[in-house]
Every structure is written in C-alpha cells, then in structure tokens.
Amino acid sequence: MISIKKFKKIFKIIAITIILVFLGYVGVYLYAKSLDKLPITSANSFYMYDNKKNLFEGTNDEWISIDKISPYLINATISIEDKKFYKHHGFDFLRIMKAMFTNVMNGKNLQGASTISQQYAKNLFLDFEKSWKRKIDEAFLTMRLETHYNKEEILEGYLNTINYGGIFGIENASNYYFGKSAKDLSLAEASILAGIPKSPTNYSPISNYDKAKERQKIILESMVKNKYITENEMKEAYNTELTFIGSKSEKKSSILMYYQDAVLKELETINSIPTSFLKTGGLKIYTNLDTNAQKLLEDRIKENIDSENELQISAVL
C-alpha cells in the first residue's frame, strides 16, 4: 500500500511534468507551424541477399490511397493503436499521463502512449536510440506532420509504411497473407493484420498463430467498445477460419519467412536497428543463407511429412 507522503510526491511530479509538457507543446507547435512541409513520400526498400549475393527478399513500395483500404482495417488500427486519432493534434495527453502514472507506480516502463502520428514520425525519420534527445526530436517531427498534413494523409502514410511481420505496407501485407488487395479485406482478416505492428515477430499469424488470435480478440473487443462493430460481428469474425497464402506461397516459403524475421530481429537487438527503420534506410542485407540447399531440404520435408501432420519441423542452412 502506497503511503500518503509518497502519493503526494508522485502527484507533484506528475503535475509539474504536465505543466512543462503543455508549455513545451505550445512552443513546439508554433515553431513547427512556421517551417516547411516534411517530405513523406514512400520510403525506400530493404533488400536481403543469400550467401551468393542473390536477392531473395526485398520489399516493394505499393503505396495506395486511404480510400482503397478496407474500412475494417482502418477502424481496427485506430481502435487498437490510437482511438483518439481524429481528436488529438499529435499527442494523447490523457494517455500519456496514464502511462506515466502506471510506470512511476511500478518503477519500470510497462506502458507506452505513442499516437499513430508519433509512430509514423518515428518510423520515417528516427533511429532506435533511446534518449531524451530522440524523444524531443520525435515530438517536434510529430508536430510538423500534424501542422502540415491532415489526418487522412498521416493515416495513409502510416498504413503504407508500417511493418506487418517483415512485409511493409498494408497492400503488400494483404497480398502476402491473403492474396487480395487491402480494399477487399474482411473484418476477420483486417483484425488479424491490425494486430501485427505492435510486435511483428510475436503477432505474425504464420509464425505465432495462437498469439495472433489472442491479439485479434483484443482488437475485436476494442472495436465493439468503440462502436465500430457489433458483438455478433465480433464473434463471427473471431470464429472465421482464415487461410494464409503466405505460408504456402511458392514465392517465399514459411521457413524463409522465419529466417527473414530472425535476421531483422538480430539487427534490431544486436545492432540497435529497428525493423521499421530498415524500411526507410534502403539497406542491403547480406546473409549466409544457402537458398539452393534450403529449397532441397524443404522439398525433402514435403515429400516425407504430411502437411496435415501436427509434427513441426524447421531447419535453416
């Protein structure tokens, strides 16, 4: 049980922080408004090569306008990532205060409060460094986006560049996972895809189906709470059996997908480069993968293991 003295101290810290944040917000807003627009064109691709320097993975920039994206996907994303997106000017101060209080009370960083605008600014222009300078840069860039672009433009850019499990942009992701355009996504499909950006490796429906379904349930419940769908629609979507084209695609095997995710994860954890930044960097990534031997290995597995068998086999050369 927290003491009254400690509670007053925490309250004082939060109150002072709120005042400073507000004053800083006004100053940044006025300065950002006086500057020119930031360029928010489609980001560069990343390219991944095998041990013989042959390209086996590269993202294509399929930028689509917001009116060509399923309303289910848009509403699912807003519900789970930033439910006040259309109401705030780049920052959700109530959410920030709640996150600060939770983190101070627990003594660790348990809860984030980034809006879609903040995430987009971070993904486009910043690296993975964790510092106060980076936080200030993020706030400033967010304000520049908000002062020069409308909500539809920001959301369109965000959805066209975000990481969906190694597939960047909603049109690429929709085609990869379901073999269809983003405008044709059903509620069940959209709620699965909207859950991936939070943690692309953990919530990929191909590599972590159970976790992806847990995330989907949270998103659907959030959509009901925000009155985007009914409870019956939620239940129907959750119980819909989905077929993921990506896991059976001739273009990219599921094992290669795991390999790509592992490489991106290593770059993120060991080299401090986030997967989202890889999209904007236009990086060329050279690996030790032997694609010929890998294909031979996978063919042998397919010949000897029934696709319906519950036995799970994975190997990378």
Regions found by a protein language model. Give the residues of each.
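Juxtamembrane regions of bacterial inner-membrane/periplasmic proteins
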Residues: 2-308, 314
